[in-house]
Structures are given as structure tokens and as C-alpha cells.
Amino acid sequence: EIASVGRDGFEYYDKLGYVPYPEVPEATAKTLEYAYADWCIARFAQSLGKQDIADQYYQKAQNYRNLYYPEHGFMWTKDAKGNWRDRFDATEWGGPFTEGSSWHWTWSVFHDPEGLSELMGGHEPMVARLDSMFVAPNTYNYGTYGFVIHEIAEMVALNMGQYAHGNQPVQHAIYLYDYIGQPWKTQYHLRNVMDKLYNSG
């Protein structure tokens, strides 16, 4: 029984540096969100002159690294014993993720794009991974949801590969091209999103 606020699986997160699955539902999403929240706490503590607290939380903000699966080049999930979950499937929704798949949550490192780039092998491999997201077949495995949730239907309707603008963890990914030196791709994909999803009404 947990409250409606706080951190589900915090005991694991503090001990292991990640929230494990299947012990905790949506564990990878929670790990990535906690890491970003820790970075925010660090920035706040630093602004108050509490550098000891800031340093502690800057270190915790690196916990996203614990769930990057280098063999596949995506965020994935581990159990409490540190074992990677088998049967890797980047198109699987639910399970360790919230309303998305590994394709979407891999980019949920808002506070450290350079660190994520390093995990991927540098800017060039990161560009290649971004490029592949927009051209990959928009197939899906609805996973633990057991049916097509509206975010899946929206991704398919958008028809921009595995990019799912209907869910927050990946919405910023288009702007990563600006960060890694290919701003024309940001412009191209943004125009595509604007034309398909927005109007003056």
C-alpha cells in the first residue's frame, strides 16, 4: 500500500540504483523519472548553497545509466538480482514502461543528453538511433496492457515510425538533433508534427 505521492519502489532505487521489474510495475519509467527528479533536487540544493546535498543528488541523477542495455542500445529493465529481462522487444508497451515502449523511454534523460550520447557511443550513433525511430515500422506489442491503449493508436495514426508524440517521454527527442549538430532534422520532423497534429483552431 503506497500513498498517491512519493516514490514507488524507493527502497530498491536507493539500494540498487534502479527500480526492478517485475518487482515493481513500470519500473524503468520510474527509474528514469526519479533520476531526472534527483537532478532537479540537486539544482535546487545548489541554488540554496547546500553543495553537499547537491552532490549527493547529482550522483543519484546518474542512475539512468543502470538501465541502459548496451547490447541492444535501448533502455530496458532488470530484476532485483541485477539480471536483464530476457526476450528484449523495443516495441513492447507496458510492463516496465508507462504508456510507451523502450523506443520512447530510452530518450527520457532530459538532464543529461551528453551522458546518454556517451552510452550510445557518441553523437553519430545517437543520430543513427534517432533516425531509425522515425523510419522503423510502427508495429507494436501491447504487452501487459492486453489491448491497444489510445497512445498506441495515436502512434500508429501519426505514422512517424516509432515516434509517439502522444506521450511525454519522447516529445523532446526531435530537439536532440539540435543538440548534436543536425538542426535541419529537428525542423523537418517538427514541421511534420505541426502539419499532422496542430492547427490554428
Task: Show which residues each predicted segment covers.
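Active-site core of glycosidic bond-cleaving carbohydrate-active enzymes
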Residues: 1-62, 66-201
